[in-house]
Amino acid sequence: MSSGFLARASASRYSVTAMDEKEFQKRCDVAFEALRRRLQEAGDVHGFEVEGGSGKLEVLFEDADETRFVISPNTPVRQIWISALTTSFKLSWSDAAGAFVLEKTGETLMELMGRILTEQLGSPVTV
């Protein structure tokens, strides 16, 4: 296996796929661009801001706590990490899903973002 990252079966509907750094970066760039566009569209409807730069995305909420979600790649382990709702979500690539997935639940990046935005805002959000 390349990069020491092993593909393994999980309890979710998908298994993760090993990849080298170049392939990870390519897939991550595509996923981040799609996520940025979809978050901006959702933000226009639901009243949150999306900022990007330095290889990460931030979702900013206009609440008393100035809550923010941070989405960033973690290249050494070939994962996308999301810090939100006092939790760190770690998503790995799945060829079967054609997306980064949270192994624990089987949610794709877009599905997970929709769920945690819905939890934060208290109304349904689709990403």
PLM ranges: what are they?
Residues 1-18:
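N-terminal mitochondrial targeting presequence
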Residues 16-70, 74-127:
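N-terminal intrinsically disordered, cationic/polar leader segments
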